[in-house]
């Protein structure tokens, strides 16, 4: 990541904090955990167990896995639930065991796998909790790892919302043998990886260790700040004076920017951060990095989702009358 300075600015440490230095209670309400989901429970049940385990008001998972499916299941804690839709932007990766119902030649299997790379059409299965309309999904990568008789182990990286069970059914039909999904494990879920996932028991042990012995070390290894789950987004760093206005949903103006990540385009989601590295909001850039650096005034990012609660940073903008349609203004010092 390369940040380009638009205007040097300092931050006031009387407000906000470094995300990785938050006290443990704040971290539990603005953090996330990546659970290694076991076979059996639903994703909703796992999220509910985490919520109850950590004595939280709310928690939500970042991508449904069927009960029998295992692997990386990110769980948002407390106020981090508002970040869940952002986790669906990057691709997801799975390792799948596919069983053919008849014998097939290796060359035919390889050709079918190539055929199902790229844009595919899918209709959600009957049990899906969404409307069964035809949709387009992208298979970025699909690789055969091992073939043992009629069993095919493969890895695939695909767009969020792809139904792997349906993919296997469709490939089996195209192959002429029919097939079904025997096992499935998610290895990557957006910005989260299988090797950082923990068992539910590990989370419980770490929480009890903190509550009973006051030792936060193990819990801090497992619970990450919400910013950890947004590291895949390009960034704009804003001045302290602009933070509270953005927290109230105001459009970001050029005058509020301190630094911009190189290569930012208008076709992506951008993360707006404080000078301390705290996530403030995400939005749609109205111009690219080059134009943002040149412009001295005007709107540069349309806010689509506010993450930080208002009031953490001081308000340095004029409150408008409800009938006033003009733009918010910074208070003159």
From Swiss-Prot:
Reactions it catalyzes: uridine(55) in tRNA = pseudouridine(55) in tRNA
EC identifiers of the protein: 5.4.99.25
Keyword Isomerase applies: yes
Keywords: Isomerase, tRNA processing
Domain PUA: 233-308
SUPFAM superfamilies: Pseudouridine synthase (SSF55120), PUA domain-like (SSF88697)
Active-site residues, record numbering mapped to chain: 66
Protein name (record): Probable tRNA pseudouridine synthase B
Source species: Methanococcus maripaludis (strain DSM 14266 / JCM 13030 / NBRC 101832 / S2 / LL)
């Amino acid at each position: 990541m390369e940040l380009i300075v638009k205007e040097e600015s300092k931050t006031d440490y009387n407000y906000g904090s470094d995300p990785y230095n938050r006290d443990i209670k704040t971290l539990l309400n603005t953090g996330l955990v990546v659970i290694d989901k076991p076979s059996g429970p639903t994703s909703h049940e796992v999220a509910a167990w985490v919520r109850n385990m950590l004595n939280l008001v709310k928690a939500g998972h970042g991508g449904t896995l069927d009960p029998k499916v295992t692997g990386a299941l990110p769980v948002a804690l407390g106020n981090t639930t508002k970040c869940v839709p952002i986790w669906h932007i990057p691709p997801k990766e799975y390792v799948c065991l596919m069983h053919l119902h008849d014998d097939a030649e290796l060359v035919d299997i390889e050709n079918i796998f190539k055929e199902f790379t790229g844009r595919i059409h899918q209709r959600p299965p009957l049990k899906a909790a969404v409307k069964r309309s035809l949709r387009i999904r992208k298979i970025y990568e699909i690789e055969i790892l091992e073939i043992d008789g009629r069993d095919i182990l493969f890895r695939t990286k695909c767009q969020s919302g792809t139904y792997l069970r349906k993919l296997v059914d469709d490939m089996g039909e195209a192959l002429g043998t029919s097939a079904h999904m025997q096992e499935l494990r998610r290895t990557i879920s957006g910005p989260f990886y299988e090797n950082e996932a923990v068992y539910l028991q590990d989370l419980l042990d770490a929480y009890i260790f903190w509550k009973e012995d006051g030792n936060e070390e193990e819990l801090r290894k497992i619970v990450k700040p919400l910013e950890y789950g947004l590291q895949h987004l390009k960034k704009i760093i804003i001045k302290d004076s602009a933070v509270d206005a953005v927290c109230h949903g105001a459009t970001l103006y050029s005058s509020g920017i301190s630094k911009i990540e190189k290569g930012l385009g208008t076709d992506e989601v951008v993360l707006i951060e404080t000078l301390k590295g705290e996530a403030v909001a995400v939005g749609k850039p109205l111009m690219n990095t080059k134009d943002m650096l040149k412009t001295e005034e005007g709107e540069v990012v349309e806010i689509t989702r506010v993450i930080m609660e208002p009031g953490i940073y001081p308000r340095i903008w004029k409150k408008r009358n409800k009938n006033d349609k003009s733009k918010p203004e910074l208070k003159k010092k």
